[in-house]
């Protein structure tokens, strides 16, 4: 018997308490749980009760809260369990350094960049749900993974679909990729209607169950903007090879077009566990308890071009792709600030794009990054400028 194949696979989940993290743990449970997987580390933020519960159920070796104020609470919850506890950015780094073979990168925002880079540098396979690694760090992140010797397996449903449909053996015949977008809750709204929408309305996605940040990003289509930039780096595409189409039913997750006119698409019910299961079992496929697609019940599949007047995020992504350099990092940082301002009711829904465009134009002359410190510097500059713009927006509301 080959004992190497019988050893549990070592996993770390960066961001286990969010939507992606909880779905990942469900997939792990379905695929055999502790009999097949050794959980090295779980990380979360403020929900330490859930984090502690997850750590106890999975037998994780380390539990980390990125909120240093929650360290004592987490330590108390895990007292006597034998599970190590850490906190803050140093705790995230400790989790990333543990010898996991496979790391789910699901921390939302720029906070997930450094620990994911650390895991990639030591050679782990990265199941990538964090958008900022590619949007902000781009080629630097790709190069880190290459040097480490691991793989990137996308977890976004759109990029997972492209990953599954893209034939690398015939890469020279690739013409385009088509990212599908649901259009979110405001697909049929006018700009006037969108001007006064609330946070609660914006977070109510018609198809997917997601966290607040991703739900608002779907409503504004900034999620799709980030995915366009991700796709460029992940699949080594030119800007004109990247298309976006609105598909309200979210059944076709994305498509790849080839030079002979063929288009390959990946279909399925909207359930993140499918993409997570593929990332965890790649290059095989897992047997998962998810709903199956019933074609007899599909009344129709609709497609429409995105309205760039109502959803300028797509236009801003194209600008970032054309400018290159650090524009992705700038767009991402400005969007995070604009999102926070909208959630805190400092600016309106449509003003988020105004903030991002101002910051991108203001910092359009930044030199390309040569080291990761350049990315963090651009991120800081963009956030400072965004806060200035948000302050002025608030005064004029």
Curated annotation (Swiss-Prot):
Function noted in UniProt:
Catalyzes the NADPH-dependent rearrangement and reduction of 1-deoxy-D-xylulose-5-phosphate (DXP) to 2-C-methyl-D-erythritol 4-phosphate (MEP).
**Organism of this sequence:** Allorhizobium ampelinum (strain ATCC BAA-846 / DSM 112012 / S4)
- Output the InterPro entries linked to this UniProt entry: DXP_reductoisomerase, DXP_reductoisomerase_C, DXP_reductoisomerase_N, DXPR_C, DXPR_C_sf, NAD(P)-bd_dom_sf
Q: What is this protein called?
A: 1-deoxy-D-xylulose 5-phosphate reductoisomerase
Specify which residues bind NADPH according to the UniProt entry for this protein.
17-20, 47, 130, 132, 211
* GO MF assignments: 1-deoxy-D-xylulose-5-phosphate reductoisomerase activity; manganese ion binding; NADPH binding
Give UniProt keywords alphabetically: Isoprene biosynthesis, Manganese, Metal-binding, NADP, Oxidoreductase
The keyword Signal belongs to this UniProt entry's keyword annotation: no
Please give the Gene3D superfamilies that the UniProt record associates with this protein.
1.10.1740.10, NAD(P)-binding Rossmann-like Domain
């Amino acid at each position: 018997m080959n004992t190497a194949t019988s050893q549990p696979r070592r996993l770390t989940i960066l961001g286990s308490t969010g939507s992606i993290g909880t779905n990942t743990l469900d997939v792990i449970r379905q695929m055999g749980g502790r009999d097949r997987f050794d959980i090295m580390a779980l990380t979360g933020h403020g929900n330490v009760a859930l984090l502690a519960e997850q750590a106890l159920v999975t037998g994780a070796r380390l539990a980390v809260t990125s909120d240093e104020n929650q360290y004592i609470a987490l330590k108390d919850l895990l007292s006597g369990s034998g599970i190590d506890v850490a906190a803050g950015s140093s705790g995230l780094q400790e989790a990333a350094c543990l010898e996991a073979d496979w790391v789910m990168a699901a921390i939302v925002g720029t906070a997930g960049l450094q620990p994911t880079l650390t895991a990639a540098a030591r050679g782990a396979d990265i199941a990538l749900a964090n958008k900022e690694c590619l949007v902000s760090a781009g080629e630097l992140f790709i190069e880190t993974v290459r040097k480490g010797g691991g793989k990137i397996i996308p977890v976004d449903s759109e990029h997972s679909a492209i990953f599954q449909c893209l034939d690398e053996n015939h890469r020279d015949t690739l013409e385009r990729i088509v990212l599908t977008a649901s259009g979110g809750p405001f697909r049929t709204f006018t700009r006037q209607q969108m001007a006064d929408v609330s946070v609660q309305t914006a977070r109510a996605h018609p198809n997917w169950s997601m966290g607040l940040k991703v739900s608002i990003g779907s409503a504004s289509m900034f999620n799709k903007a980030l995915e366009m930039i991700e796709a460029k780096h992940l699949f080594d595409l030119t800007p004109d090879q990247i298309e976006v189409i609105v598909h309200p039913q979210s059944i076709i997750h994305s498509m790849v077009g080839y030079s002979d006119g063929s288009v390959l698409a990946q279909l399925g019910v909207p359930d993140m566990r499918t993409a997570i299961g593929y990332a965890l079992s790649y290059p095989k496929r897992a047997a998962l308890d998810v709903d199956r697609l019933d074609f007899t019940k599909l009344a129709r599949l609709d497609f429409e071009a995105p309205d760039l007047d109502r959803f300028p995020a797509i236009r801003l992504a194209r600008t970032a792709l054309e400018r290159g350099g650090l524009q992705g990092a700038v767009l991402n940082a400005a969007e995070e600030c604009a999102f926070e301002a909208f959630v805190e009711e400092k600016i309106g829904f449509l003003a988020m794009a105004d903030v991002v465009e101002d910051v991108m134009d203001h910092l359009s002359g930044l030199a390309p990054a040569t080291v990761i410190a350049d990315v963090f510097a651009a991120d800081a500059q963009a956030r400072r400028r965004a806060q200035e713009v948000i302050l002025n927006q608030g005064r004029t509301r």
